[in-house]
Amino acid sequence: MSSYANHQALAGLTLGKSTDYRDTYDASLLQGVPRSLNRDPLGLKADNLPFHGTDIWTLYELSWLNAKGLPQVAVGHVELDYTSANLIESKSFKLYLNSFNQTRFNNWDEVRQTLERDLSTCAQGKVSVALYRLDELEGQPIGHFNGTCIDDQDITIDNYEFTTDYLENATSGEKVVEETLVSHLLKSNCLITHQPDWGSIQIQYRGRQIDREKLLRYLVSFRHHNEFHEQCVERIFNDLLRFCQPEKLSVYARYTRRGGLDINPWRSNSDFVPSTTRLVRQ
């Protein structure tokens, strides 16, 4: 269990509680979670973060009524800046989007502006929103993470409790390498409900070579760990930076969708540009 799982800031969340679904617009449904909850225990300070990045959300179940009452549908792309005070809690995001269902808007841009305004207010930070018509995305190929997959290792694992022990002495030699490693075995659990979160992760770095077996064992140790997606990515970035001390580091995870939403956080201290094409499990 995370050290802050019972923090009072989480007590008012609708997550894990029975809730009514509203289909008329209500911005008050959105709920934020302070990023400081997991950053403080990691020693990460808002004015001196070792990374930049965004939380990329894909909205697959977005619908509203036009001015004449005809339903509209879109796929939304949301980017929430890492400097925001709060992350957006996903169940509240789903409930908020449902409140658009029977609400009339004059045009698509009014919907986009409404989303951008409300999400920025909840997050207390910069948010950008783009809406796509379905025909704009039809035929879009399934993407993949570039890099070397480390999953096919003939190793025995019998411990699934989170630990950084595997990263102790995980680098070797003095030669500096630059490589991208990928795993599809990332699995953590919701901080509140403990429902499983499934993801693929891409780790791009420059520095002393990281032992792939130790890295895989470390990633598998998240299997019983309870944290939100964004928090896991920041924890992984911080742990790799601390124990492996790469010159450059980027960590990008793309999680499977739940409730019509997928969350894809990335953190980097270099000029990393994430691919936004959905992966095969998304």
UniProtKB/Swiss-Prot annotation:
InterPro entries: GTP-CH-I_C/QueF, NADPH_dep_7-cyano-7-deazaG_red, QueF, QueF_N, QueF_type2. Transmembrane segments: none annotated. Pfam families: QueF, QueF_N. GO terms for cellular component: cytoplasm. Substrate binds at residues 88-90, 229-230. The active site is at residues 190, 197. Its EC number is 1.7.1.13. SUPFAM superfamilies: Tetrahydrobiopterin biosynthesis enzymes-like. It catalyses: 7-aminomethyl-7-carbaguanine + 2 NADP(+) = 7-cyano-7-deazaguanine + 2 NADPH + 3 H(+). One of its GO terms (molecular function) is preQ1 synthase activity. NADPH binds at residues 90-91, 258-259. Keywords: Cytoplasm, NADP, Oxidoreductase, Queuosine biosynthesis. GO terms for biological process: queuosine biosynthetic process; tRNA modification. Pathway: tRNA modification; tRNA-queuosine biosynthesis. It is found in: Cytoplasm. Disulfide bonds: none annotated. It is an enzyme of class 1 (oxidoreductase). Homodimer. Catalyzes the NADPH-dependent reduction of 7-cyano-7-deazaguanine (preQ0) to 7-aminomethyl-7-deazaguanine (preQ1). Belongs to the GTP cyclohydrolase I family. QueF type 2 subfamily. This is NADPH-dependent 7-cyano-7-deazaguanine reductase. It comes from Escherichia coli (strain SMS-3-5 / SECEC).
